[in-house]
Amino acid sequence: MLVVIRGAGDIATGIALRLYRAGIRLVLTDLPQPTSIRRTVCFSEAIRLGETVVEGVHARRADTAAEAAALTEQGIIAVLADPAAGCVQKLHPDALVDAILAKKNLGTHITDAPIVIAVGPGFTAGVDCHAAVEPCAGIHSDGCCIRVRRCRIRAFPV
């Protein structure tokens, strides 16, 4: 099974680690200049450094979709500088996870893969994706899978 994850920041990396440990081949996409803050726990660092290791799991930068596919065949997580996730058209993944956390949909469509899961606000399950996940830390619905409504944007006092 091949899964493409849009985003390679800390939340996307956590998702990737879980899927990788379940034996799933992974390609992550991010910006050419990643904006991750917690860089030591982000696979996005592979774009800057060529490769990185998080919790003992290796990820390596790929420059093309074909190179990414070859890396996944070797059991290595591939990370592409591909913010629009154009690689999806070439890789034909079994599932797509949007974990960009941009608070709005930046181009993920329910037709991008047989299974499309979106993490964070800005997505409507059944319209943009098959299921949406509410990621707000500390909220009782954290990690809740939503299949029929929109994820909410919450404002927290500073």
Predicted regions, residues:
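Well-ordered secondary-structure scaffolds
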Residues: M1-V158
